[in-house]
Amino acid sequence: MRAVRCSLIRGVAGLRMASSALDEMKEQMLRRWKEDQKKIDDLRKKHGHEKLCDATIDAVYGGMRGITGLVYEPSLLDPAEGIRFRGLTILECQEMLPKAPGGKEPLPEAMFWLLMTGEVPTEEQVRGLNAELHRRADPEAIAAAQKAIAALPRNAHPMTAFSVGVLALQSYSKFAAAYAAGKSNKKTYWEYALEDSLDMLARTPTVAAMIYNRETKGQVELAAPSNSDLDWAANFAKMMGYQDEEFWECMRLYLSVHADHEGGNVSAHTTTLVASALSDPYLAFSAGLNGLAGPLHGLANQEVLNYLLSMQERVKADGVNMHDEAALEKALSNYTWELLNSGQVVPGYGHAVLRKVDPRYTCQRNFCLRHKFDDDLFKLVNTIYSIMPGILKEHGKTKNPYPNVDAHSGVLLQHYGLTEQNYYTVLFGLSRQMGVLAGVVWDRLQGRPLERPKSITTEMLAKKYLCNSL
């Protein structure tokens, strides 16, 4: 009887904490919105006709690379510092965001709070948000996603299953229901978008864990039940079947640092674009996942891992001692020059914007060093890191000879036995929802309109520029 009473007391306390945290999140958002709105009004009134960039013909044909055409609030990619989440660098986030007891990595819930509000949350606010997410993990909605995924062909890709699972959750969209009933308007869209975003964040870890067990065991089910005493990342890892608390800490890091990467990448822009039509967050994020599933966006870490595994096989085939640092450096240097001289690129090195080592790479490397990784793959990636920038500088055909986040993430997962490469993009998507959903909520809060850029044809460009030059 006492145990039941204590459980009820904890349950009531958890509800109060969750409700308080949500109220505080909304208050912080509205306070920032008022500050931002004055800036937006002044910018549009005083500088509305100022040019941000010139769109060249090369840029139009080149994937719009370099064209500044979006406002996206959660994050900004700094060429010198890497990604900044609401102005904070990766290192600052690691230092300032609340952590699990005894842990050193930021909790993803804390990262979500930062992206959504622009403020670093307190430990109490993070506990409240965690309680709120556990409260919103509706078994009925999750069962609908489970049923939809189970109906897929056995060979369906995990990203197909994730996108379908999110679409199945859409049946429970509060944004869509309120809009259909005429209960929402431009001033309240953001609140319904926030409701859907919190619900999605609460339910997708269970869906993603089911997809993992479908991939490894053939059954759309959990390896362990959800545990409301655990944080978001630890609970997800345990539902996948991982009991190692060091891996839970790894997941906290992985899910936090992949949370956003400004608004122009395929998954973020797709989510933003679809949501601009007042499609609810589920529809928008499912579309973003489909973009993330493309090999040019979400498969980079798999390509790096395949490259590393091929290097590992070649080292062994050539009889190189992995523990002889000088011999390993010499062999890898020779392999790299062969690759470059054949016209290929080194996977995991270089970045479209960054001009230094990706801080997301650095924090993953530091995690491995702190936890004393000693496996061959880590030795390999660490040795490549020591020689590659010098080789690429000498080669002279790359603007950024330093590693990006993808150069390390696969090694991290392989170390803990998560070897199912097809699943890696699901982890990426689970993390990335935090940033893109924060972007969607802020678009609705700021009253952002439907996206409708102008397109042009080759024939029209030819008539304008080529005919006059003949």
Curated annotation (Swiss-Prot):
> What does UniProt give as GO cellular component?
kinetoplast; mitochondrial matrix; mitochondrion
Q: In which pathway does it act?
A: Carbohydrate metabolism; tricarboxylic acid cycle; isocitrate from oxaloacetate: step 1/2
Disulfide cross-links: none
Q: Which biological process, per GO, is one annotated for this protein?
A: tricarboxylic acid cycle
Residues of the active site are: 297, 351, 406
Q: What EC number(s) is this enzyme filed under? A: 2.3.3.16
What does the record give under GO molecular function? citrate (Si)-synthase activity
Enzyme's top EC category = transferase
Write the record's keywords in alphabetical order, separated by commas.
Mitochondrion, Transferase, Transit peptide, Tricarboxylic acid cycle
The listed locations are: Mitochondrion matrix
Q: What is its main location?
A: mitochondrion
Per its UniProt record, what PROSITE patterns does this chain match?
Answer: CITRATE_SYNTHASE (PS00480)
The record lists the catalysed reaction(s) as: oxaloacetate + acetyl-CoA + H2O = citrate + CoA + H(+)
What SUPFAM superfamilies would the database entry show? Citrate synthase
Q: InterPro entries from the xrefs?
A: Citrate_synth-like_lrg_a-sub, Citrate_synth-like_sm_a-sub, Citrate_synthase, Citrate_synthase_AS, Citrate_synthase_euk, Citrate_synthase_sf
Assigned protein family = Belongs to the citrate synthase family.
**PANTHER family per the record?**
CITRATE SYNTHASE, CITRATE SYNTHASE, MITOCHONDRIAL
This protein's assembly is summarised as:
Homodimer.
Task: State any further remark.
Answer: Citrate synthase is found in nearly all cells capable of oxidative metabolism.
Protein's name in the database: Probable citrate synthase, mitochondrial
Q: Which organism is it from?
A: Leishmania major
